[in-house]
């Protein structure tokens, strides 16, 4: 039988499908996702869960003119498949390939770029208000998950949309089964009744008639209380109604017919409406259904032709988690905080061993930072483990609530530097630059996983804010000698040499080691310094380099502006340094998706490129 999926390229192609065809298409899409994403890597279980929801949205709305915003965006694969991008999945999340998130520059059907959570309602509301001011006619749809709805930004947007009654449709994709579908028939009946034209006209007429007298107003008030009491029993989210947003649901997010009926009617509802759909993460793939978190993001299938390298022992996340557990055994005031990332940040085991000292605040980085500040102000030693890209969401709180008060909060910044496949929204290349400008903040970086325990212990004992930044994954050079004693503001000379000194921080120190081996074959033997401290820099060592006549090359997995290299350059200018200096890092641009090794090579930060930079300097 000919594949339906192969005959579909654009949203309008769905209009001719009957119920049987749509059901068949759902199965074909799931099979395609499982086969394709298993090869390239990507977000799997979340996309398997929204197949029917996406199909229903695309059959019910016209996304040639209607606009859709996908919160976070990693559940947009089905939408991409059905908007002419199916063939691009062979290069999903690869360098110059199809993005794993909505991208306006990728398709006319992508109306807003996303990557971080809780932004869709604000963005959709902005589009809706632009539509109204320009006197245009189209529907704006924001799709947000139950997890993203915990973000403060989403709640701020709900408050705004409900207050001004702006017309838009919000789809709450609840894939946690947190609200049972057993409300069943009565809920469906009330939803159908409340969407009906007769009900809304009658409601308006009654309010108009009775509202003209004091007795009538009293009757309306009593009727409203009775109605609210019933709704509290059968509709699980009076919360939305109280914010001024009409609530419909919950409805089965895998029942296309039921969703079509609801979606076709809400377009005519004036004001904001939220439709609560319940979906199953990993639907149609038994392994993902049993372990949706495990299959949330899957790695690419290994190339059988490539010889597997022997990786170093632990990931940085694992090393951090183990170190914190050991420290917590001795330091009873130590507590751990995460913003919905216990697995990714290495805190899962800590949460099991010390549940009363572990705090997962949900997708709420701003709250997490100030929570840590409050704990520190009252004698605890909080450690906030967070991805670099997400810490920037709590920028003001780090300044206002932590640094101004000089509170002892430790920031364990995971995924610092290039992270690869998720692209611009997830690269961790700015934390050094924005943290360096904050008074009282100290920034350190381990050169290897074995250095994390001593560095973390030092940070926790320091009575002021400390940020420890480390990359995703494992070391690429194993068995480096790890510092056991950390001295404030002091760098480490890890390899002596002549003529030029390479100053590198974090993983870039390992790249410097590999570059040195290449350079030695060409008659150049650089000195290598580990910038253990990114802030403050080791001014005394820099002055010694000047006196000894070294040229200097700095390497960092961060943007150059505001980074380590700029701090070094500033001090060298102050001491009238006359040697050659070169700064390696990322220029003033966002770094796209791609394999980490490819990106390092593209931006001149791999060992070969580093050695070539030095060779050009002398040739």
UniProtKB/Swiss-Prot annotation:
Keywords: Isoprene biosynthesis, Magnesium, Metal-binding, Thiamine biosynthesis, Thiamine pyrophosphate, Transferase. This is 1-deoxy-D-xylulose-5-phosphate synthase. Its EC number is 2.2.1.7. The keyword Magnesium applies. One of its GO terms (biological process) is isopentenyl diphosphate biosynthetic process, methylerythritol 4-phosphate pathway. PANTHER family: 1-D-DEOXYXYLULOSE 5-PHOSPHATE SYNTHASE-RELATED, 1-DEOXY-D-XYLULOSE-5-PHOSPHATE SYNTHASE, CHLOROPLASTIC. It comes from Clostridium botulinum (strain Eklund 17B / Type B). The keyword Metal-binding applies. Thiamine diphosphate binds at residues 74, 115-117, 147-148, 175, 285, 365. The lineage of its organism: Bacteria, Bacillati, Bacillota, Clostridia, Eubacteriales.
């Amino acid at each position: 039988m000919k594949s339906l999926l192969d005959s579909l390229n654009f949203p309008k192609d769905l209009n001719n499908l009957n119920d049987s065809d749509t059901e068949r298409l759902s199965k074909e899409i799931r099979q395609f996702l499982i086969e394709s994403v298993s090869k390239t890597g990507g977000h799997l279980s979340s996309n398997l869960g929204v197949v029917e929801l996406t199909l229903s949205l695309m059959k019910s709305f016209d996304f040639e003119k209607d606009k859709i915003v996908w919160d976070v965006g990693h559940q947009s694969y089905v939408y991409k498949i059905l908007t002419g991008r199916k063939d691009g999945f062979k290069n999903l999340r690869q360098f110059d390939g199809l993005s794993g998130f909505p991208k306006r520059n990728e398709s006319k059907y992508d109306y807003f770029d996303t990557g971080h959570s809780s932004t869709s309602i604000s963005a959709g509301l902005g589009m809706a208000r632009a539509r109204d001011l320009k006197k245009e006619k189209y529907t704006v749809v924001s799709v947000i998950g139950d997890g993203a709805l915990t973000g403060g930004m989403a709640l701020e947007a709900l408050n705004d949309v409900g207050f001004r009654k702006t017309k838009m449709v919000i789809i709450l994709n609840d894939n946690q089964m947190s609200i049972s579908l057993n409300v069943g028939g009565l809920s469906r009946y009330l939803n159908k009744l409340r969407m009906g034209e007769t009900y809304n006209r009658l409601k308006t007429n009654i309010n108009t008639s009775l509202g003209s007298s004091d007795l009538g107003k009293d009757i309306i008030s009593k009727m409203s209380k009775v109605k609210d009491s019933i709704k509290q029993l059968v509709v699980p989210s009076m919360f939305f109604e109280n914010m001024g947003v009409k609530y419909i649901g919950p409805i089965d997010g895998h029942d296309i017919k039921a969703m079509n009926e609801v979606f076709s009617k809400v377009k005519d509802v004036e004001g904001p409406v939220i439709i609560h759909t319940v979906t199953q993460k990993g639907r149609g793939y038994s392994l993902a259904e049993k372990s949706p978190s495990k299959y949330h993001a899957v790695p690419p299938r290994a190339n059988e032709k490539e010889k597997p390298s022997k990786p170093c022992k632990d990931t940085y996340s694992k090393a951090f988690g183990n170190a914190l557990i050991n420290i917590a055994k001795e330091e009873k005031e130590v507590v751990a905080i995460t913003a919905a990332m216990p697995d990714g940040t290495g805190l899962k085991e800590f949460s099991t061993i010390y549940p009363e000292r572990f705090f997962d605040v949900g997708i709420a980085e701003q709250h997490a930072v100030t929570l840590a500040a409050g704990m520190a102000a009252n004698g605890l030693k909080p450690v906030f483990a967070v991805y670099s890209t997400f810490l920037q969401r709590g920028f003001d709180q780090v300044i206002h609530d932590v640094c101004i008060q000089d509170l002892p909060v430790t920031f364990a910044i995971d995924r610092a530097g290039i992270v690869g496949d998720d692209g611009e929204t997830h690269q961790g290349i700015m934390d050094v630059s924005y943290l360096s400008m904050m008074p009282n903040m100290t920034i350190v970086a381990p050169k290897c996983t074995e250095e994390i325990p001593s560095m973390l212990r030092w940070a926790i004992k320091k009575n002021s804010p400390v940020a420890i930044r480390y990359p995703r994954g494992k070391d690429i050079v194993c068995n480096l000698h790890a510092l056991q004693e950390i001295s404030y503001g002091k760098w480490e000379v890890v390899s002596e040499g002549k003529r030029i000194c390479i100053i590198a921080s974090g993983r870039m120190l390992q790249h410097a080691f590999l570059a040195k081996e290449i350079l030695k074959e060409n008659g150049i033997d650089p000195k290598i310094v580990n910038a253990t401290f990114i802030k403050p820099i080791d001014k005394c060592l820099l002055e010694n380099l000047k006196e000894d006549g070294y040229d200097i090359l700095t390497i960092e997995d961060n943007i150059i502006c505001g980074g380590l290299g700029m701090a070094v350059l500033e001090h060298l200018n102050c001491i009238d340094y006359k040697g050659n200096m070169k700064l390696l890092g990322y220029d003033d641009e966002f770094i796209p998706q791609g394999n980490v090794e490819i990106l390092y090579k593209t931006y001149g930060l791999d060992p070969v490129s580093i050695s070539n930079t030095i060779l050009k300097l002398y040739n």
